From Swiss-Prot:
Belongs to the PTH family. GO terms for biological process: protein quality control for misfolded or incompletely synthesized proteins; rescue of stalled ribosome. The record marks 12 as: Discriminates between blocked and unblocked aminoacyl-tRNA. Its main location: cytoplasm. It comes from Xylella fastidiosa (strain M12). The active site is at 22 (proton acceptor). One of its GO terms (molecular function) is tRNA binding. This is Peptidyl-tRNA hydrolase. InterPro entries: Pept_tRNA_hydro, Pept_tRNA_hydro_CS, Pept_tRNA_hydro_sf. GO terms for cellular component: cytoplasm. Pfam families: Pept_tRNA_hydro.
């Protein structure tokens, strides 16, 4: 299987959204940029901030859309076309209501599961054949409270759990970049 050439973090732009649960994907790619000592650069034709990091012996593009979550596909579609990257070589990091804070899973292919960023991406691509990093943020318990939940800030304990999950994901990232997704999934999904 082909390795990763593009890692996308989903979230909403703007200072009022920086620390929200919905921006778990942004937190992941921001952590990669910081860890590798790189900087984001605005690329207006891609509707995103972009950076490059060196992982597992190769350069990987990072993309952080400046569009709102429900329009993320526009930026991703532009990036894939500009860099001539196949969707199967892309990892999209996003918040996941169905997992508690601290849980993180890799997945390939599938539907959007109600996640508006994934909904827009699959609509524009015409399929869901790309990798996802599903970062648990928990569920408020009632469907009516989902919007305020995802746009709310995690508690201190939730933040600690989410940060630990993102760290575990970054540890297995070299395997995924090298194309060993089974190995990355096994290592990430095995709780020690």
């Amino acid at each position: 299987m082909l390795g990763l050439r593009l890692i996308v973090g989903l979230g909403n732009p703007g200072s009022e959204y920086i620390k929200t649960r919905h921006n778990a994907g942004f937190r992941f790619v921001d952590g990669l940029v910081q860890r590798e000592g790189q900087c984001w650069a605005l690329e207006s034709k891609l509707f995103a901030y972009v950076a490059r990091v060196f992982i597992a012996g190769q350069w990987v593009w990072l993309l952080r859309p400046v569009t709102f979550m429900n329009l993320s596909g526009k930026s991703i579609f532009a990036g894939l076309n500009f860099w001539k990257i196949k969707p199967e070589q892309m990892l999209v990091a996003h918040d996941e209501l169905d997992f508690p804070p601290g849980a993180v899973r890799l997945k390939f292919d599938g539907g959007h599961g109600g996640q508006n960023g994934l909904r827009d991406i699959t609509k524009l691509l015409g399929h869901g054949r790309f990798h996802r990093l599903r970062v648990g943020i928990g569920h408020p318990g009632h469907k009516e409270r989902v919007v305020s939940w995802v746009l709310g800030c995690p508690t201190c304990d939730e933040n600690i759990a989410i940060d630990a999950a993102l760290e575990r994901a970054s540890v297995v990232l070299p395997l995924a970049v090298a194309g060993d997704f089974d190995g990355a999934m096994k290592k990430l999904h095995t709780v020690v």
